């Protein structure tokens, strides 16, 4: 009798869930993925490269916005640049993050700026935003250049002894971004062992998160993923403890009137009362740099190898500028003189955005967008990949690397002739948009500029067999290229 009752309840739940997911209402969003199944929704269609599946589905809609079901969660996916702007820039209804088990673990119960919501997020944003402006930019540039020079020297030594280079190894360029951000945040140069001790738990954490968690979509599966959640928590706690030690060391030598680094600024801003928040924000910055920055660096190597003509044009532009300055390396002062190099950097993130589906947000309240009803609590995704490949003109060949397209885009803007529907700056948004976009995007762009331009200046990059590399990539926490080797040759 008990088993029969349980069976009836399960059948009843399945029927109700099916009706809930497929019931049509007025002003509802289109659902081009078709019928949503009970319990799993459209999860079976989103297992491989979901950003491509959703971009393809979006083409069937009128306005580039759709709904689907990620298990028990209603997803709203948008790739139309004008609607993205309407949602993320023109309203404050999409500044919250979903509260999931993984986000809770990573943020140590929502104590960081990445996953906190509401007034708490605004407060935490107020802690880290001033920290990047109160520390003068010149010391930042000097720190970046110091590590760029270290990296160039290391690459030269490698090219002399063995031209075949593996950019995925921790002892190679894989640790560059972490070295820079640690000195920016903590105010001192970390030893190799200290850097590796920070990278270790982050690599383990990202390795776990690269594998999908169906339990984030279907809550009753959580007990079956207890071990994975526990391992995530272990790695996050290890990173937290390492940063906590740095925090305690800072307290011993802190000058309230002259904060020397980002952590100092945040400690002073919190009046020494929010230790956990400061530590979690620092962990947030470390993790964001480690995975996203490294992914962009890997795609840089892939595209420079596959587009030898682009690499050559970039080199020629640098040489021409340096002949006028008399310097033997590129600095931030050269950024406006190297529009083609700037175009290379923008093309990398346009063609292969590190996060093709940006970090999700939630609707704080019910809202009408472009005539469609978006309910409170739904998960909202910006399909960065879909915005590029659905909204660039086919005649512009969006799949090809053309840095000069950014130069032309800027020229048209200055002349007042730019078509707003074909503005690359609005179509390509690899770091999201609105007040909840990536907080360190400006700093990251300078970092990428100095690193990439000086690599192109000093080395010719190719594949060991002179064949093109695979650009399909592997979708996990970020969109990374498959493993490859680089043939480094000194210029």
From Swiss-Prot:
The positions annotated for binding heme are: 438
Q: Any idea where this protein resides? A: Membrane
Q: Name one GO cellular component term.
A: membrane
Identify which cofactors the protein needs according to its UniProt entry.
heme
Q: What induces it?
A: Expression is almost undetectable in vegetatively growing cells. Small amounts of transcripts accumulate between 4-8 hrs of development, continue to accumulate until they peak at 16 hrs, and decline thereafter.
Keywords of the record, alphabetical order, are: Heme, Iron, Membrane, Metal-binding, Monooxygenase, Oxidoreductase, Transmembrane, Transmembrane helix
Q: Which Gene3D superfamilies does the UniProt entry name for this protein?
A: Cytochrome P450
Q: Where are the transmembrane segments?
A: 1-21
For this UniProt entry, the molecular function terms from Gene Ontology, in alphabetical order, are: heme binding; iron ion binding; monooxygenase activity; oxidoreductase activity, acting on paired donors, with incorporation or reduction of molecular oxygen
**What is the membrane topology listed in the Swiss-Prot or TrEMBL record?**
Single-pass membrane protein
Q: Which InterPro entries match?
A: Cyt_P450 (IPR001128), Cyt_P450_CS (IPR017972), Cyt_P450_E_grp-I (IPR002401), Cyt_P450_sf (IPR036396), Cytochrome_P450_fam2 (IPR050182)
User: Where is the major localization of this protein?
Assistant: membrane
Q: Its Enzyme Commission number?
A: 1.14.-.-
Pathway participation: Sesquiterpene biosynthesis
Query: Its catalytic activity?
Result: discoidol + reduced [NADPH--hemoprotein reductase] + O2 = discodiene + acetone + oxidized [NADPH--hemoprotein reductase] + 2 H2O + H(+)
CDD domains in the record, alphabetically?
A: CYP1_2-like
- Family, per the entry? Belongs to the cytochrome P450 family.
Q: Write out the function statement from the record.
A: Cytochrome P450 monooxygenase; part of the gene cluster that mediates the biosynthesis of the trisnorsesquiterpene discodiene which has a function during later stages of multicellular development, during the transition from fingers to Mexican hats. The terpene synthase tps8 converts its substrate farnesyl diphosphate (FDP) into the bicyclic sesquiterpene alcohol discoidol. The cytochrome P450 monooxygenase cyp521A1 then catalyzes the oxidative degradation of discoidol to form the trisnorsesquiterpene discodiene.
Q: Kindly provide the name given to this protein in its UniProt entry.
A: Cytochrome P450 monooxygenase 521A1
To which species is this protein native?
Dictyostelium discoideum (Social amoeba)
Q: Which gene encodes it?
A: cyp521A1
